[in-house]
Amino acid sequence: LICQDLCFALNQLKPSDEKRNEVIKNILGYFPDDLVLLSPFTADYGKNIKLGKNVFVNINNYFMDGATIKIGDNVFIGPSCGFYTANHPLDYTNRNQGLEKALPIKVGDNCWFGANVSVMPGVTIGAGCVIAAGAVVTKDMPANSLIAGAPAKVIKTIEQ
């Protein structure tokens, strides 16, 4: 509940309030270089979120960080995206017992996420990807790819 309370406190502050950076530091355990994180923002633990340099997190993002969520340098995350590490059993008997596991998410450098993207447990997204609005990324994606759809697939390779 500590992280949830800190996220609530962050989300009550004005964008211009100098206390924001201190609250973000308390959520993550550090303050990344050149981070822009807009409210509202929600995380489960905070300590499992590893953000690179020059990361932009737009409004209304959720980081379900039961496992590590590692975001590379120069990553731009559009509004209302979710990074979900928790995975529940298909078998209802196990699910009803509260069993779940968390799988890490990794995002390479120089990626751009459109609005309302969902990244599911255990996914790795290579560097230089553009993920279209509304995509649901359920499997690993290669670097320099335009990714779209639900479930998401590679639309084309981005020539750099």
Protein language model regions, located:
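Terminal amphipathic alpha-helical/low-complexity segments used for targeting or macromolecular assembly
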Residues: L1-D34, A152-K156
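Flexible, glycine/small-residue-enriched loop-and-beta-strand segment within the central core
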Residues: F41-L51, F56-I125, A150-E159
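Extracytoplasmic/periplasmic beta-strand context in beta-sandwich domains
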Residues: V123, N144-S145
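Conserved G/P- and acidic residue-centered "switch" motifs that form tight phosphate/ATP-binding loops
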Residues: I131, G149
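Short hydrophobic beta-strand element within catalytic cores of glycosyltransferases
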Residues: V137-T138
